[in-house]
Regions:
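Solvent-exposed soluble domains appended to multi-pass membrane proteins
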Residues: 1-208
Length: 208
């Protein structure tokens, strides 16, 4: 578990080696970049340790962030991230948290676009390691072999919001709790979409 790269992004100045723009120094955005670089370096040292101690080729490495780094609801962060990305920083970027798995001896790579959450990590890793998960209280599913991808999103957005990779939809419920006043985005490019009320209502009911 790494905590340095977590708000409030406090890092000893002796470890903050990135040269930032003057306008970013001391800002939440600037501090975030410094801790990202530091965490990346620390992770590199872990990899070096595994290799040095003959553990790397016998270790499955899984990396996942439990939530986004920069909150778009904070105006100063929203502006900084939009400027940094060169496009609007919206929920499609904020909620896009990667789950990376390295398997020793597997000389191929794959990108899976199935939507999932932390509840799906254990079943995914267990299947890769051929572990039996047929127990009464195992939640989630194997993301690499899932029939669908669906997340009921409740953090930062209202109950009834959802993300589904089946229809490439990211939907946020309206502030009045209705689907009609909500907002629909494409998972593919973040573009705004017209709301199909019947389809969105089905997914929204499921999310609740």
């Amino acid at each position: 578990i790494t905590l340095t790269n977590h708000i409030p992004y406090e890092l000893d100045q002796s470890l903050a080696s990135l040269k930032l723009k003057d306008s970013d120094v001391g800002s939440t955005f600037g501090n975030y970049l410094q801790t990202v670089r530091y965490t990346d370096e620390a992770f590199g040292k872990l990899i070096e340790y595994l290799k040095k101690n003959d553990m790397y080729d016998n270790t499955v490495i899984a990396i996942y962030g439990d939530h986004q780094g920069m909150n778009k609801e904070t105006p100063s962060v929203q502006w900084k991230m939009t400027d940094f990305l060169g496009k609007e920083y919206d929920y499609d970027e904020m909620l896009n948290v990667p789950f990376i798995i390295h398997i020793p001896g597997l000389n191929e790579s794959k990108v899976a676009d199935t939507v999932g959450g932390e509840v799906d990590i254990m079943p995914t890793i267990a299947n890769l390691m051929d572990l039996d998960t047929k127990q009464p209280y195992v939640f989630g599913h194997d993301l690499l072999n899932a029939d669908e991808g669906f997340v009921a999103q409740i953090s930062y957005v209202g109950e009834g919001s959802f993300i589904t990779s089946d229809d490439n939809m990211l939907f946020t419920i309206g502030k009045d709790g209705t689907v009609a006043s909500g907002r629909l985005m494409s998972l593919l490019d973040g573009s705004r979409k017209n709301i199909n009320e019947k389809l969105c209502q089905k997914y929204s009911d499921r999310a609740q």
